[in-house]
Regions:
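Sec-dependent N-terminal signal peptides
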Residues: 1-5
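Buried hydrophobic residues that stabilize the cores of well-folded domains
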Residues: 16-267
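C-terminal motif of bacterial Sec signal peptides marking the signal peptidase cleavage site
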Residues: 10-13
């Protein structure tokens, strides 16, 4: 699947800078747009994954060249806040498997509920539901999945996620702390809106993370994370920025792994 987790390639986009455009009032699913989350526009490319936008600037597909793995978005003419029908359909395909998500959005255009159907060879093999909640700043703070009763809580301080707690039936509780300044590095402003939930925050909500890049999972953190720690294992994130403050490379490593990881961004 096209995901944003360690050991996978990431996504890219064909986008323009919408920072000077006024934010338009959203009424229904056809109005949602990533510019409401990414003030400088989406990056053109991150690693090898391409984000394709339609003429309205909406994300319509994630796809990696020469691969059948893809995620597509379909926007519906359904009023925001309605629970009668989904405003967006997200389909993630990795043949022979396919996950279809019916996304229900609140008045701000963010997902609050999702119905997932898992197909294999066109036969339904599983279903799940997801629920999302946001804080007063419209940042994602709570994720629940019916599968294994998974529950992720994101705690914020000064506009940043400083702790994530994940509970799953039959598994130990996982707690990760995140820091945004070190002895040698000051906080880095997150000017572009980039969020890597699974990789940098240890908040793993499976295939649905791609919905963030469609502008559907809330507002970004104030700063870019520099370190995280879980059960004594530490991760270090080193960002390279261009003159406009856009991240051009994320290099990161884990204390319990010898391998280093690198995600380039093209703007």
């Amino acid at each position: 699947m096209v995901t944003l987790t360690v050991g996978t390639t990431m996504m890219a986009s064909c986008s323009k800078d919408n920072s000077d455009e006024p934010e338009q009032k959203m009424v229904n699913g056809t109005d949602v747009n990533p510019r409401n989350v990414f003030p400088l526009g989406l990056p053109k490319k991150i690693s090898e994954i391409v984000l394709t936008l339609n003429e309205k600037g909406q994300l319509v597909q994630f796809s990696e060249p020469n691969s059948n793995d893809r995620a597509t978005f379909e926007y519906k003419d359904v009023a925001l806040g309605s629970t009668q029908a989904p405003q967006v359909i997200l389909t993630e395909t990795d043949e022979p498997d396919k996950h279809v998500y019916e996304l229900y959005l609140n008045q701000d255009g963010f997902v609050t509920h999702a119905k997932e159907t898992h197909y294999s060879n066109d036969h339904i093999i599983g279903k799940a539901t997801w629920d999302f909640a946001y804080n007063a700043d419209n940042q994602l703070k709570d994720v629940k999945c019916s599968t294994d009763k998974k529950h992720i809580v994101l705690e914020y301080q000064n506009g940043n996620v400083v702790k994530t707690t994940t509970t799953t039936v039959g598994k130990p509780t996982e707690v990760t702390t995140i820091t945004y300044a070190t002895a040698s590095t000051r906080p880095i402003e997150n000017k572009t809106g980039v969020m890597l939930f699974a990789t940098t925050l240890d908040a793993d909500f499976d295939n649905l993370e791609v919905a963030y890049y469609a502008g559907l999972l809330g507002k970004p953190s104030k700063n870019l994370p520099l370190q995280s720690e879980k059960s004594g294992d530490k991760a270090t994130f080193k960002w390279t920025l261009d003159g406009n403050g856009n991240p051009t490379v994320l290099n990161y490593s884990f204390s319990n792994l010898s391998e280093n990881f690198r995600f380039p961004f093209t703007w």
